């Protein structure tokens, strides 16, 4: 079966501070998903640890590719994930600018 692209998909990593707790997720709408995480509605895990900083993301055309990458990252050792973040975002800055509130942990 041929792959169909509906829209773009994202694999993303959230945290609450540099080198803090990490959460890896996949979504078809990064803005909506981040707003839900900020409100504590994204997932119980992100709400519990107040994971509101988007520190890494990758964009995919196909959902199957995004899900495969999410699974791959979830199976990585923690240090590999940290290295990936620091390679692309060495200052651990919040990459989501949808709300000024999210710029602080």
State the predicted function of each range.
Residues 44, 71-84:
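Short arginine-rich
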Residues 1-43, 47-59, 64-71, 88-90, ...:
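GIY-YIG nuclease catalytic motif and its immediate N-terminal context
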